[in-house]
Amino acid sequence: MRKRKLSDRVRCSARLKNRSCSGAHSSSDHEADTYGPKKKAVSSKNTDKKSPKKLENDEKGLMESDEQEFINKTDNTASNESNAGNVNTCPSASPFSDLNEVSRNGLTDDSEDGVGFSHKTSSEPSKVREVYLNGSPFVDEDSNQPMPLGLFFENADLMQDLPPAVPCCASMSRREFRNLHFRAKEEEEDDDDDYADGLVNEGNI
């Protein structure tokens, strides 16, 4: 009898355990069925919220990288241009230095026409281009003095100091000039008198 009771108790306890396990499984399955889609929806919302942020961050990173590349390229081009400018200015310094030496020694270059001029005349037109851009024939706006032809036309040959023109009657004295002047006046008066006499004679006729 005792053995049967013990066996019945064991069976009952086993049944209760099985029922509790089955209830737990069923409850877990029910929770999975009910909360599963909600969790999936929440996770999908989180991914949707995170995706634009990630896209914005990626776009910002791309923009920054593009800006850095552009800045690097501009810096490289500027450095290359400066290097090229230095290379171009170095060989051109030698002729100017030679011209400076020549001007110090008091020598000038002779052109094909035989007119000598120094290197300063070549630099003056460049200054004129900077100063006289309005094309006015006067030196300054407030002055009445005309501009030299060399500055106006930017020609080095016209800027040369030409010798003064020799007058053709340089040997004539003042007395001779006065005599000629008085003679011319007398001739004009005689012509006027003759013309008046002619008019009077015509009126009488």
Swiss-Prot record:
Compositional bias ranges of the Basic residues kind: 1-18
Keyword Metal-binding: no
Comp. bias (Acidic residues): 187-196
Entry GO terms, CC: nucleus
Composition skew (Polar residues), residue ranges: 71-108
UniProt feature, compositional bias: Basic and acidic residues: 46-63
Compartments where located: Nucleus
Keywords of this entry: Nucleus
Highest taxon above the source species: Eukaryota
Keyword flag Nucleus: yes
Any Pfam family hit: UPF0688
Region (Disordered): 1-128, 184-205
PANTHER family: UPF0688 PROTEIN C1ORF174
Similarity-based family: Belongs to the UPF0688 family.
Designated name of the protein: UPF0688 protein C1orf174 homolog
